[in-house]
Amino acid sequence: MEQHNLTTVNEFILTGITDIAELQAPLFALFLMIYVISVMGNLGMIVLTKLDSRLQTPMYFFLRHLAFMDLGYSTTVGPKMLVNFVVDKNIISYYFCATQLAFFLVFIGSELFILSAMSYDLYVAICNPLLYTVIMSRRVCQVLVAIPYLYCTFISLLVTIKIFTLSFCGYNVISHFYCDSLPLLPLLCSNTHEIELIILIFAAIDLISSLLIVLLSYLLILVAILRMNSAGRQKAFSTCGAHLTVVIVFYGTLLFMYVQPKSSHSFDTDKVASIFYTLVIPMLNPLIYSLRNKDVKYALRRTWNNLCNIFV
């Protein structure tokens, strides 16, 4: 064991999504298309909510940061995954692996709390409309975004440093298509009980606390909606529709990964779920908000008309 502890690992080999040669080209084309749509959609949402004068409300402030999160973790994973489809050996350096893990944890963790902040914003807008501008002031919105960034950066650095200061045994094949904390643990020679406990505790705290905020907000929203007339209900459902869809898809995927029985848990199952929340969800989110939000649709139409007037 002592000899294993002295083994230096300079790089890792990612097993990728599949080792079936016939699937490499079609999967590359599929995921490239998904990634390009995701980047364009989220960049477009960031620019639109920043520049359009009618989208300068707390809801779109949070939506801009949600798009930034989606762009962040999809870009942390996507380009390297695409490169792996066209090379013979899916190699990632030791330090790039650590960097990828750190950024991924920041973005994916922050998204949980951004979605929570958005649900609270919806609660205030529907249940306390007269006090909305007072409660959801610019300073409050900035704090609700800054805290998740700082907290998740701390957790990310803690987990990444803990893992990469432990000893690897020399076996460097990661059973995944990117560097994530759980697939890295079997490669460690050192006792992993402490880091496993850290990951479990913070994953549970993040997932449960953010989900409770979302559930409580929607429970109070539902109570308020039941007291409204039919026109008010329709407007409230329209306001909540896009966010609720995103919440169900995102939390549903994470709960599928972490709540399934240990006997049925496998890295292959995790790969499928990971593909969904690292690539598919970041592509879907801007589409959901574009299709289900009237303000965003009108802003897109105004922007398109302005571009047509400039170039035509």
From Swiss-Prot:
Q: Spell out the molecular function terms from Gene Ontology.
A: G protein-coupled receptor activity; olfactory receptor activity
For this protein, the parts annotated as crossing the membrane are: 26-46, 55-75, 100-120, 140-160, 198-217, 237-257, 271-291
PROSITE patterns (UniProt xref) = G_PROTEIN_RECEP_F1_2
InterPro entries (UniProt xref): GPCR_Rhodpsn, GPCR_Rhodpsn_7TM, Olfact_rcpt
Q: Which residues lie on this side of the membrane: Cytoplasmic?
A: 47-54, 121-139, 218-236, 292-312
Q: Name one GO cellular component term.
A: plasma membrane
For side Extracellular, which residue ranges?
Answer: 1-25, 76-99, 161-197, 258-270
Which Pfam families does this UniProt record tie to the protein? Answer: 7tm_4
Q: Where in the cell is it found?
A: Cell membrane
**Glycosylated residues (UniProt):** 5
Instruction: From the record, give the cysteines joined by S-S bonds.
Output: 97-189
The record's comment on protein family reads: Belongs to the G-protein coupled receptor 1 family.
- Cited function: Odorant receptor.
Q: What is this protein called?
A: Olfactory receptor 8K3
**Which gene is this protein's source?**
OR8K3
